[in-house]
UniProtKB/Swiss-Prot annotation:
This is Probable alpha-L-glutamate ligase 1. Belongs to the RimK family. It comes from Shewanella amazonensis (strain ATCC BAA-1098 / SB2B). Mg(2+) 2 binds at E260, N262. It is an enzyme of class 6 (ligase). The gene is rimK1. Its EC number is 6.3.2.-. Mn(2+) 2 binds at E260, N262. One of its GO terms (cellular component) is cytoplasm. InterPro entries: ATP-grasp, ATP-grasp_RimK-type, ATP_grasp_subdomain_1, RimK, Rimk_N, Rp_bS6_RimK/Lys_biosynth_LsyX.
Amino acid sequence: MRIAVLSQGPELYSTRRLVEAAKERGHEVRVINPLECYMNINMRASSIHIAGEELPIFDAVIPRIGSAITFYGCAVLRQFEMMGVYTLNESVAVTRSRDKLRSMQLMSRRGIGLPITGFANKPSDIPDLIEMVGGAPLVIKLLEGTQGIGVVLAETRKAAESVIEAFMGLKANIMVQEYIREANGADIRCFVLGDKVVAAMKRQAAPGEFRSNLHRGGSATLVKLTPEERSVAVRAAKTMGLNVAGVDLLRSNHGPLVMEVNSSPGLEGIEGATGKDVAGAIIAFIEKAAHKKPKQTGARG
């Protein structure tokens, strides 16, 4: 097969591992920076170009699109879809999962466990918003934040009001969530591939920190999932329409709660913590799925 990896960073661990795994299984693979692509959109022969070169037809595309380039990256991914190329995660699913509020709304409709979440526009609604999520302490999240950036733990009601007012004053979109104290600064990253969890790790926040992201100094260890946790992770990924997803769970007193569904989950932490060849599993999945239609979201684009 001829496989393209859409990535801005050929030197990044996840990109390198996908390239290695594809080559080990006998495939031709090329890393393509989506920002270097431009598109010819027409009814007869749509195409994608880089620096005057028309790209060849690929059998499959693996999107590794950073959040900062979601719009353009997904436009390029969608162009591949229009050309009939199999994409591991479809553009519509990537776009959907990048909208944190929409993700929460979709999962709540499916009955998937979530922290109580509030969203408002007017400062006058702040007191009621805080009450809705159970009062302080509570978590305030920028909808555009990634890797723990833009996530604040407000330990008192006064602090919560001040932070929410400040974000609203900056016209930043935020959501407010209940703080799951019993999680003790830990979450579980479930790596979902197709209809099963192929690897999972527990991420523990660094001392004095409540965010467990590895980019924030958290540590990762192997974890054994319960059947319910596996089921919730797979259902969350399917709700987003993702074939590959990193689903972050919190263990609460009333069962697993989904914090986030990531459409471009990193491989370094999960492979390091579990010792599993996740990159190889992804390529094996593509080998089986690339020729199947219709795709998971049921529509191209």
